[in-house]
């Protein structure tokens, strides 16, 4: 029996794309910061001259799938991280954005055989979003760990 697992020790061999929603940028900037910190601590070059990392900004979480799809046509990425923050309001817009963003990201991942980490916070309030993007608990770090694991796993399987 062969057991395959992803590695958390070295991200330096990965080509990573990050697509970030600008809407609720108070939150998404913090998540991105946590994500980049994790990638850097695991060996990925996150400098402005990095050849292993590309970051794309889009207006909102609804646009994440099309940007991820276009990014994957540009270069052979090992993994893409989609970051956003959708905070429930008084209308059903929240439900539509989350539903379409999650379906679209999954579809792009399956069509391109590249893992896309769903790093879109879905919260009922700004306070909840801030708690998930804060110093003590920044989910951006977790999303980056998932990316390292899945990127290395798929590379090993191929």
Curated annotation (Swiss-Prot):
Coiled coil: none annotated. SUPFAM superfamilies: Lumazine synthase. 5-amino-6-(D-ribitylamino)uracil binds at residues 23, 61-63, 85-87, 118. (2S)-2-hydroxy-3-oxobutyl phosphate binds at residues 90-91, 132. It catalyses: (2S)-2-hydroxy-3-oxobutyl phosphate + 5-amino-6-(D-ribitylamino)uracil = 6,7-dimethyl-8-(1-D-ribityl)lumazine + phosphate + 2 H2O + H(+). InterPro entries: LS, LS/RS, LS/RS_sf. Pathway: Cofactor biosynthesis; riboflavin biosynthesis; riboflavin from 2-hydroxy-3-oxobutyl phosphate and 5-amino-6-(D-ribitylamino)uracil: step 1/2. Transmembrane segments: none annotated. The active site is at residue 93. GO terms for biological process: riboflavin biosynthetic process. Catalyzes the formation of 6,7-dimethyl-8-ribityllumazine by condensation of 5-amino-6-(D-ribitylamino)uracil with 3,4-dihydroxy-2-butanone 4-phosphate. This is the penultimate step in the biosynthesis of riboflavin. This is 6,7-dimethyl-8-ribityllumazine synthase. The gene is ribH.
């Amino acid at each position: 029996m062969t057991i395959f697992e992803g590695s958390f020790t070295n991200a330096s061999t990965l080509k990573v794309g990050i697509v970030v929603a600008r809407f609720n940028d108070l939150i998404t900037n913090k998540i991105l910061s946590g994500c980049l910190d994790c990638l850097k601590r695991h060996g990925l070059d996150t400098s402005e001259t990095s050849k292993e990392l590309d970051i794309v900004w889009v207006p909102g979480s609804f646009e994440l799938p099309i940007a991820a799809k276009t990014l994957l046509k540009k270069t052979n990425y090992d993994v893409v991280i989609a970051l956003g923050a959708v905070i429930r309001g008084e209308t059903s817009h929240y439900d539509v954005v989350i539903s379409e963003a999650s379906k679209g990201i999954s579809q792009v991942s399956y069509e391109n055989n590249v893992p896309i980490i769903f790093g879109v916070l879905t919260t009922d309030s700004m306070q909840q979003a801030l708690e998930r993007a804060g110093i003590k608990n920044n989910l951006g770090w977790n999303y980056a760990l998932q990316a390292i694991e899945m990127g290395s796993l798929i590379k090993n399987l191929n």
